[in-house]
Amino acid sequence: MKYILAILVLLMVACKPDKKYHASEKLQSGSAAIKDIVAFQKELDATFKNPNSSPLPDRFRKDFEGLDFFAPDTTYVVKARFERTPDAVPFLMPSTTDEKTREIVYGIAHFQLNGVEHQLEIYQSLDLISQKQYRDYLFLPFLDETNGAETYGGGRYIDLTIPEGDTITIDFNKAYNPYCVYNKKYSCPLVPRQNYLRTSVRAGVKAFVKD
């Protein structure tokens, strides 16, 4: 979350960076992974309840009890082969507004999920790497077959860090919605079509329903 909040700041919207959420580079045991996922959910709920960090307008935040998450499921914690792309060309990633962020494909994750082989591009923000606290941050936006029904139609995000070796752990239980889902004042990067997963990812934050 800290990574994408920083991107939102760069897109000239009013938001305040908060604590980061990213997958551990060491695949955890089932019980430890579940505890980690639950801790992530609690911390994300706390962020949304806090008036200084919440993307929710006051009219929604005052009655906010918690986000709607899928139940923690370690099936969606995958250890992917990480293919670095040192020759990738920088590009401008469009957003939900006229603003764009400067990104580069840092690498490609190759993994199996739900019995199918997949790959996702993982990005690094060229606008953030000059800042010490974001030098190791990577951004993974993705689409899947739950979008538009169980989850937000525009896809979700996951924050990662640069791995030391040739594998990277992706915990889809830590997938969260772009902030523009909750408040149109935010400008959010659009998920590239090549990051569409042809499977249902029933993990992470569900679609936001305004009561």
Predicted regions and their residues:
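C-terminal partner/receptor-binding element of secreted or periplasmic proteins
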Residues: 186-211
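Bacterial signal peptide processing site
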Residues: 16-19
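Mid-length scaffold segments of soluble, non-membrane domains
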Residues: 86-153
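Positively charged n-region of N-terminal signal peptides that target proteins for export
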Residues: 1-4
